[in-house]
Amino acid sequence: MAEACGVRRMKLGSQGLEVSAQGLGCMGLSAFYGAPKPENEAIALIHHAIHSGVTLLDTSDIYGPETNEVLLGKALKDGVREKVELATKFGISYAEGKREVRGDPEYVRAACEASLKRLDIACIDLYYQHRVDTRVPIEITMGELKKLVEEGKIKYIGLSEASASTIRRAHAVHPITAVQIEWSLWTRDVEEEIIPTCRELGIGIVAYSPLGRGFFASGPKLVENLEKDDFRKALPRFQEENLDHNKIVYEKVCAISEKKGCTPGQLALAWVHHQGDDVCPIPGTTKIENLKQNIGALSVKLTPEEMTELEAIAQPGFVKGDRYSNMIPTFKNAETPPLSAWKAA
């Protein structure tokens, strides 16, 4: 295993935001990956991350829902807030038990105010639209976010799972600081359009699930150990008919990591780190030992030949199964109507 080293700092985007080169995805502490973790343990892990130099903390109002933001708010008391860059998201509503993606101005503002209250802070550092509302022109959503920047409620604007054309349209209204997207050795379709678009526009790239939702940390046995309400149980890539094929990638990563003297997870994470100085992966974990391993990936150095070898075993399209079920929108269905089509209620 590669030992943890200091976490370098990096510029995210072109508007002045500086963050740790690796962030902490906080979702799994409260939602989707089984039962919520005990509050004291979750806060201890967050504090350990910050003490180790991981200062970009990523949450969303949908994690819990809402409870993850409350947890972060508690963890940032007593002067801790000033030590971190805090990112949260809006855009997925569960009002009256109905799941809905919303980007209308009224909802954008209400969601921001609610997040500020739950987090118990005056300003959000990086505020993402979690999913794109395909009924509302992105210019309308961005217009309200721009107002929130001007009012000092948020500092920087981000998009998550947005298409290349939506990113361009949004960026024309107000600079986008970061696009959060799934990027890992087994999710590489973003390399075709999303990544080049971000780089052309000077937008930072935040890679979520850089360990393939834990697959590269544990391999196929991950599925056997998932709690009954872990949403990964339903993901296409973890179904038996696809897993038998996908484990080939893990086995080859294991072979290379053994030669490198690091874990498979560290190797997979190092591959993301080596994509460029504009890329910040945000692996999540519920265990301090795993956090240390993730930070250790920063010390794994890969040669161009090793990068080529890794990419050859995980070429785009090789992995079987979609990232999500058909019910969850992604950048592939994230176009919005033209601004001329908008009629405010």
Swiss-Prot record:
Any GO molecular function: oxidoreductase activity
A single GO cellular-component term on record: cytosol
Active-site residues annotated for this sequence: 63
Keywords, sorted A to Z: NADP, Oxidoreductase
Superkingdom of source: Eukaryota
Family classification: Belongs to the aldo/keto reductase family.
Induction details: Up-regulated by iron and sulfur starvation.
Protein name as catalogued: Probable aldo-keto reductase 4
Pfam families listed in its UniProt record: Aldo_ket_red
Keyword NADP annotated: yes
Enzyme class: oxidoreductase
Binding residues annotated for substrate, in chain numbering: 130
Enzyme Commission code(s) on record: 1.1.1.-
Residues holding NADP(+): 209-219
